[in-house]
């Protein structure tokens, strides 16, 4: 189990209860071990963050980015966060909300290919 800041637990529970349409759409495709038997958690506290989706077995983090993530200050924060997580052995995959809503098959395919590669290593 990965460590996390305890104060994040309540926030993550609220986020799970109020998931966005985009999060719901992807969750329907990756929950219940649907992708090669890998289990995902949603709105998972991890270190000092809450990540959208997390697969502990592969240390894969999936983030869904709304329009606010394309503003310079958010891009900088996301880059620092991703760099910290990558330095600790996590892989971060980012998809825009538009990608998930319009091209869900392509998004799931990218996740599947990553998991397949990890599984064969």
Swiss-Prot record:
Matches recorded under Gene3D superfamilies: VSR Endonuclease
Record Pfam families: DUF559
Domain of life, source organism: Bacteria
Disulphide linkage map: none
Family note: To E.coli YcjD and H.influenzae HI_1162.
Name of the protein in its database record: Uncharacterized protein HI_0925
